[in-house]
Amino acid sequence: MNKYIIYLIALVSGVLGVFAFSPFDYWGLAYVSLLGLIFVAKTSKKSTALFATFLWSMGFFCFGVNWLNVSIHQFGGASLGVSYFLVSLLSAYLALYPMLFTYLVQRFNVQSAVIFSVIWTFTEFLRGWLFTGFPWL
Protein backbone atom coordinates (compact mmCIF):
# COMPACT_ATOMS: atom_id res chain seq x y z
CA MET A 1 0.00 0.00 0.00
CA ASN A 2 1.20 3.53 -0.76
CA LYS A 3 2.85 5.06 2.31
CA TYR A 4 0.94 8.33 1.89
CA ILE A 5 -2.35 6.46 2.15
CA ILE A 6 -1.04 4.82 5.32
CA TYR A 7 -0.10 8.25 6.67
CA LEU A 8 -3.58 9.56 5.90
CA ILE A 9 -5.24 6.54 7.55
CA ALA A 10 -3.09 7.07 10.62
CA LEU A 11 -3.81 10.78 10.90
CA VAL A 12 -7.56 10.42 10.38
CA SER A 13 -7.86 7.52 12.82
CA GLY A 14 -5.89 9.51 15.40
CA VAL A 15 -8.23 12.49 15.07
CA LEU A 16 -11.27 10.17 15.25
CA GLY A 17 -10.01 8.91 18.60
CA VAL A 18 -10.55 12.34 20.13
CA PHE A 19 -14.30 12.05 19.51
CA ALA A 20 -14.47 9.08 21.88
CA PHE A 21 -13.92 11.46 24.81
CA SER A 22 -15.99 14.29 26.30
CA PRO A 23 -17.72 16.43 25.20
CA PHE A 24 -18.46 14.22 22.16
CA ASP A 25 -18.65 10.79 23.84
CA TYR A 26 -18.80 8.67 20.70
CA TRP A 27 -17.08 5.86 22.58
CA GLY A 28 -17.10 3.43 19.65
CA LEU A 29 -14.61 5.63 17.82
CA ALA A 30 -11.97 4.65 20.38
CA TYR A 31 -12.00 1.18 18.85
CA VAL A 32 -11.90 2.54 15.31
CA SER A 33 -8.96 4.74 16.21
CA LEU A 34 -6.98 1.95 17.84
CA LEU A 35 -7.76 -0.43 14.99
CA GLY A 36 -6.34 2.16 12.60
CA LEU A 37 -3.18 2.31 14.68
CA ILE A 38 -2.87 -1.48 14.82
CA PHE A 39 -3.47 -1.71 11.07
CA VAL A 40 -0.64 0.74 10.48
CA ALA A 41 1.65 -1.08 12.90
CA LYS A 42 1.06 -4.48 11.32
CA THR A 43 0.95 -3.70 7.59
CA SER A 44 3.80 -1.25 7.13
CA LYS A 45 7.57 -1.28 7.07
CA LYS A 46 9.15 -0.18 10.34
CA SER A 47 10.07 3.37 9.27
CA THR A 48 6.70 3.97 7.62
CA ALA A 49 4.87 2.53 10.61
CA LEU A 50 6.77 4.65 13.11
CA PHE A 51 6.16 7.87 11.18
CA ALA A 52 2.50 6.92 10.66
CA THR A 53 2.22 6.29 14.40
CA PHE A 54 3.72 9.72 14.99
CA LEU A 55 1.02 11.20 12.74
CA TRP A 56 -1.67 9.17 14.55
CA SER A 57 -0.39 10.54 17.84
CA MET A 58 -0.21 14.13 16.63
CA GLY A 59 -3.80 13.90 15.39
CA PHE A 60 -4.90 12.35 18.64
CA PHE A 61 -2.99 14.54 21.08
CA CYS A 62 -2.96 17.92 19.28
CA PHE A 63 -6.73 17.89 19.04
CA GLY A 64 -7.25 16.07 22.33
CA VAL A 65 -5.22 18.44 24.49
CA ASN A 66 -6.24 21.57 22.60
CA TRP A 67 -7.74 22.86 25.84
CA LEU A 68 -4.17 23.58 26.95
CA ASN A 69 -4.04 26.38 24.38
CA VAL A 70 -6.64 28.27 26.42
CA SER A 71 -4.67 27.76 29.62
CA ILE A 72 -1.35 28.79 28.10
CA HIS A 73 -2.67 31.70 26.02
CA GLN A 74 -5.40 33.27 28.14
CA PHE A 75 -4.23 32.45 31.64
CA GLY A 76 -0.50 32.06 31.06
CA GLY A 77 -0.16 35.19 28.97
CA ALA A 78 1.75 33.53 26.13
CA SER A 79 1.04 34.47 22.54
CA LEU A 80 -1.22 32.21 20.53
CA GLY A 81 1.70 31.05 18.36
CA VAL A 82 3.75 30.09 21.40
CA SER A 83 0.73 28.32 22.85
CA TYR A 84 0.24 26.20 19.72
CA PHE A 85 3.96 25.48 19.56
CA LEU A 86 4.01 24.26 23.18
CA VAL A 87 0.97 22.05 22.68
CA SER A 88 2.57 20.61 19.53
CA LEU A 89 5.78 19.99 21.45
CA LEU A 90 3.88 18.22 24.23
CA SER A 91 2.02 16.17 21.62
CA ALA A 92 5.30 15.19 19.98
CA TYR A 93 6.61 14.02 23.35
CA LEU A 94 3.42 12.06 24.04
CA ALA A 95 3.79 10.47 20.59
CA LEU A 96 6.82 8.57 21.86
CA TYR A 97 4.61 6.15 23.78
CA PRO A 98 2.40 5.00 20.88
CA MET A 99 5.59 4.83 18.80
CA LEU A 100 7.05 2.50 21.44
CA PHE A 101 3.88 0.41 21.08
CA THR A 102 4.37 0.18 17.31
CA TYR A 103 8.04 -0.64 17.70
CA LEU A 104 7.32 -3.47 20.17
CA VAL A 105 4.49 -4.86 18.03
CA GLN A 106 6.78 -4.99 15.02
CA ARG A 107 9.85 -6.14 16.92
CA PHE A 108 8.10 -9.17 18.39
CA ASN A 109 5.74 -9.74 15.43
CA VAL A 110 2.70 -9.74 17.70
CA GLN A 111 -0.31 -11.68 16.42
CA SER A 112 -2.42 -12.04 19.58
CA ALA A 113 -5.05 -9.50 20.63
CA VAL A 114 -4.13 -10.21 24.25
CA ILE A 115 -0.50 -9.30 23.64
CA PHE A 116 -1.57 -6.16 21.75
CA SER A 117 -3.58 -5.20 24.82
CA VAL A 118 -0.71 -5.92 27.19
CA ILE A 119 1.72 -3.83 25.15
CA TRP A 120 -0.79 -0.97 24.79
CA THR A 121 -1.53 -1.00 28.52
CA PHE A 122 2.18 -1.02 29.31
CA THR A 123 2.89 1.99 27.09
CA GLU A 124 -0.15 3.83 28.48
CA PHE A 125 1.08 3.09 32.01
CA LEU A 126 4.45 4.58 31.10
CA ARG A 127 2.77 7.66 29.63
CA GLY A 128 0.78 8.17 32.82
CA TRP A 129 3.63 7.55 35.21
CA LEU A 130 7.04 8.32 33.69
CA PHE A 131 8.41 11.85 34.29
CA THR A 132 5.35 12.65 36.48
CA GLY A 133 3.08 11.45 33.66
CA PHE A 134 0.32 12.88 31.55
CA PRO A 135 -2.63 10.52 32.02
CA TRP A 136 -5.30 12.73 30.41
CA LEU A 137 -6.72 11.52 27.13
Feature-to-residue mapping (PLM):
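Membrane-embedded alpha-helical bundles of multi-pass enzymes
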Residues: M1-L137
